[in-house]
């Protein structure tokens, strides 16, 4: 039906699992996606492992707990952080830690206000009627612009390799994600108990005002590898860092 109607809405995501989803149905979904850019495909096994059976998809690929939600989504614009750095060392030791700390504190305060002062969870009809539960909420620690960040840092180090096409550049991207992941794992928020007291890392797609900022950890449009398998291999290096979702377009 969607293939014939070509509707722009609603947004549809299929929880895809090789052990559950019939191949013929999966193929029909691919054919529909090629016509309408939906459904999106969610890795059901991975989401289930990270969030449990009772997870849902919000928007196109945001994994959150059923009956919960995200207090807030803030994002690191990594390319802009790299522009502040004198070199790779300065980026890792000073610029990135500073911005992550500021963003985490900002998120903490937003969450504290929502829970302790706003009265939302006491007065909103969704909470009063049992559709949402405060103790199932978390928050999304987002990022965009990995490609620009890596390319800027490579240039600062006098190297020509580019994100998505050079092993050293891609390794640098992984190193950046390891630093972000370590910071998030060390930061505790008392109202994110549903996710172990931590925010969920999220590869954000972007907003309308973004210019020259590549979504999440994607390779910039027009610079994709010639072979699809190479792009898939590249994606696989970053997928594991984002329990609340990451996505790509092929």
Task: Give the residues covered by each predicted segment.
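Conserved catalytic cores of very large enzyme subunits
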Residues: 1-135, 156, 162-166, 170, ...
């Amino acid at each position: 039906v969607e293939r014939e109607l070509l509707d722009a809405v609603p947004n549809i995501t299929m929880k895809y699992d090789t052990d559950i989803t019939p191949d013929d149905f999966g193929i029909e979904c691919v054919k529909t996606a090629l016509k309408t850019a939906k459904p999106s495909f969610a890795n059901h096994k991975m989401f289930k492992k990270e969030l449990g059976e009772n997870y849902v998809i919000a928007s196109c690929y945001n994994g959150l707990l059923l009956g919960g939600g995200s207090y807030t989504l803030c994002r690191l614009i990594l390319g802009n952080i790299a522009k502040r750095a004198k070199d790779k060392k300065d980026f890792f030791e000073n610029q990135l830690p500073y911005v992550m700390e500021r963003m985490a504190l900002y998120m903490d305060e937003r969450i504290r206000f929502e829970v302790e002062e706003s009265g939302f969870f006491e007065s909103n009809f969704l909470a009063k009627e049992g559709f949402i539960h405060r103790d199932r909420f978390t928050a999304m620690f987002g990022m965009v612009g990995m490609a620009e960040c890596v390319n800027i840092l490579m240039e600062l180090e006098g190297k020509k390799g580019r994100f998505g096409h050079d092993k050293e550049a891609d390794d640098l991207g992984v190193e950046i994600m390891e630093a972000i992941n370590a910071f998030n794992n060390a930061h505790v928020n008392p109202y994110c108990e549903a996710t172990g007291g931590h925010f969920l890392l999220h590869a954000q797609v972007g907003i309308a005002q973004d210019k020259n900022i590549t979504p999440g950890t994607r390779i910039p449009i027009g610079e994709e590898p010639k072979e699809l398998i190479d792009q898939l291999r590249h994606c696989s290096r970053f997928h594991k860092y984002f329990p609340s979702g990451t996505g790509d377009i092929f």
